[in-house]
Amino acid sequence: MRRVAALLAAAALVAGIAGCGGGGAEPGAPRGATLVLDFQPNAVHSGIYAAQANGDFRDAGLNLRIQEPSSTADSAKLLETGRADFAVMDVNDFGIARERGLDLVAIAAIVQRPLASVIARNPGEIRTPADLAGKNIGVTGVPSDDAVLDTVLRSGGVDPSSVHRVTIGFNAVADLAAGQVDAATAFWNAEGVELQRKGIPVREFRVDQFGAPRYPELVVAVARRNCSEAGALLDGLRKGYAALTLDPRAALGDLLDQVTGLDRGSQEAQLAALESARAFVPADGGAASPALAPEDGRAWLGWATRRGLVKRSSAARIAAGFGASGGCR
């Protein structure tokens, strides 16, 4: 009995030691982490899913879980409360979160140029932004829509107050197809592609071709307190984007394999549009890359302050959130 008791005590001691720290994880084992997306998975996220499929995040020390958001407001909240480690955010949402006082840092770019546009039906009638004067234009109700629309209108010498804005939510495809509006703010890589696939003639006015600078539409953000974890995520992303460059169709296949319910034809068309626009390639050229140049973030900030999306008094606070790729500062 005494021997049995001693063995049981020793076993309990070993179990207690093993249970202390790291939740029982073995030394050197990948650390669990969560990346929240900006929207439901789609072709724009192909580099992320390629890295996940190839084990690049695990090799970098992360057991990464990719999480879909329940709303576009999720990302900042989850980072703020510590319920997510990383988040893909629209750069406009990132800037507004910084303005609100959240200490987030942008460490990578998922795409390297704006995806926002004004899409018009009846391209025979609407050839330039000047032709939008007096038209009914749909907006989602998101603040950045007004900044995008005003920029495109002003590029054609149109007074923004001369158009009739209609809040249509995220129904641009249906409302443009039905002729409910003459034009709408929408993403050219998503709604623009779907309209073309439906055979509806449209004209796109991409915001960086009509008055806005080139800036990264989507960034990866981290709470500054978690900056030490950024390097591992970036290592995985770089390899994922290298795979995307080497074989885009295989990267898209990784997305489709991991996310059920996506339409292959739609996603192939979206990826083709992104590649044609070199949306994954930094402004200085080269191959697809998640590298985020701080000056690209500042280019967005200059435009956003001019259009009233964020206050000029918040510019310094927001600018401090655009850290160089590879680390936080």
Whereabouts are the PLM-identified features?
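Bacterial N-terminal signal peptides
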Residues: 8-17
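Conserved C-terminal helix/tail region of periplasmic/extracytoplasmic solute-binding proteins
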Residues: 297-329
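Surface-exposed patches in mature extracellular/periplasmic domains of secreted proteins
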Residues: 106, 164-165, 244-255, 313-316
